[in-house]
């Protein structure tokens, strides 16, 4: 059984360096992606799902920020030098700045909003899988239970979000009046829905 280490150990500080507060697959990117994609969704159910999950991702962003701050707020100058936190400290002290594990700042270039519900839902599903893999990789490096437990929770939520987006994709395609889902844009081509087809026949 692994003993629970204090949160100021070398190992924990190194983990704080790789937590995805602002990386391409981060909670920040997820929240902006979903809250932006929702506007072009043609069905209220889809708008609701993206709003709910996008809002939840903001809560997850706060969790990651809190973990990083708790791991670094009491570091001494020697610990900062020895534990790989110096570059970050020079720019931000122990403030929480949205950057990737590799150190580059968050950029919206890592997300996409196409305005096509089918495309955007696939984008969202892929984002959840990438976030899950990121958390899997963090868990491989982490022995601090104060970090592992919330990361496991966040990982589990990525799986749930993936499933909900999949359900929404099925809901959308079931309401379309053609089997070739790629022949039109359900957000732009309004008559592609079955109810519109029925109205046209009347």
Give residue spans per PLM region.
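Non-heme di-metal
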Residues: 1-202
């Amino acid at each position: 059984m692994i003993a629970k280490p204090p949160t100021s150990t070398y190992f924990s500080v190194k983990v704080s360096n790789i937590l995805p507060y602002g990386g391409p697959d981060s909670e920040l990117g997820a929240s902006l992606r979903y809250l932006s994609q929702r506007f072009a969704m043609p069905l209220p159910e889809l708008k609701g799902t993206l709003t709910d999950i996008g809002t939840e991702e903001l809560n997850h962003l706060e969790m990651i920020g809190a973990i990083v701050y708790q791991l670094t707020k009491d570091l001494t100058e020697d610990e900062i030098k020895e534990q790989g936190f110096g570059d970050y400290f020079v720019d931000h002290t122990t403030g929480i700045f949205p950057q990737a594990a590799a150190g580059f700042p968050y950029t919206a270039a890592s997300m996409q909003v196409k305005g096509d519900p089918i495309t955007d839902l696939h984008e969202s599903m892929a984002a959840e899988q990438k976030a899950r893999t990121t958390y899997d990789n963090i868990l491989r490096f982490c022995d601090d239970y104060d970090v592992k437990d919330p990361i496991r929770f966040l990982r589990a939520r990525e799986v749930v979000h993936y499933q909900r987006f999949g359900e929404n994709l099925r809901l959308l395609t079931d309401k379309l009046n053609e089997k070739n889902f790629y022949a039109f844009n359900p957000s732009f081509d309004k008559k592609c829905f079955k109810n519109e087809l029925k109205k046209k026949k009347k």
